[in-house]
Amino acid sequence: MISIKNLTKEFSGQKVLDGIDIDIEKGEVVALVGASGAGKSTILRSLNYLEQPDSGTITIDDFKVDFETITKEQILTLRRKLSMVFQQFNLFERRTALDNVKEGLKIVKKLSDDEATKIAKEELAKVGLSNRENHYPCHLSGGQKQRVALARALAMKPDVLLLDEPTSALDPELVGEVEKSIADAAKSGQTMILVSHDMNFVYQVADKVLFLEKGHILEQGTPDEIFNHPKEERTKEFFASYSKQYL
């Protein structure tokens, strides 16, 4: 069980997150949707402490952090429990795809090279990159780099996987491979929080959808409830151009 309570964040005196509360069951995929500037990516960056929240707590099983009193040791523990896939990939340019995935396994998980290689190969295969494992990032397409980043995060087996636009750089024919990898990971008990503007991806993958408006969670429910039967007028307006696809 993951519980996020009263998460707040201000930039230049303006609240971008205002008392965010999210409860997530183990293995659940939660999608954050809304207009640009609603606070979706800020939530992910705050949870991973890449942005310092002004207040709030996160509880992961028996590990609880208060962001107002968080220690350096707690930050390190939190980042071991949360893995994040960024829009910008953040790969090591002078290391192969395989080595990019192996790195965290050897440094953080303290695995041997053979153990790390085995896991890295398995995760790259899941995202369709077995034939690219010895390629350097400069020889990979944007979509392939995104899948290496996803494989690297999944390889760490985090308590919570944070995904910021995981399909944004993928060719349409490759989106299904990533969706399957995410769905397979969820079935194995991988909890995820997803930010995406790809509503088809959200509808197919998410168990729960949270619609954000100006730093608030305006409405939440199943994909069908939010897409096809929203209660709030602003939610209805936002999904008006999408909902007919999912009736």
Segments the model singles out, each with a brief description of its role:
Residues 48:
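Helix-to-loop junction immediately C-terminal to a conserved catalytic motif
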Residues 65-83, 187, 229-230:
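ABC ATPase NBD coupling module
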Residues 161-164:
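Catalytic Walker B motif of ABC-type/P-loop ATPase nucleotide-binding domains
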Residues 202-204:
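A short, surface-exposed alpha-helical micro-motif characterized by mixed small hydrophobic
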Residues 136-140, 144:
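Conserved ABC ATPase signature
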Residues 135, 156, 188:
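Conserved signature/switch motifs of ABC ATPase nucleotide-binding domains
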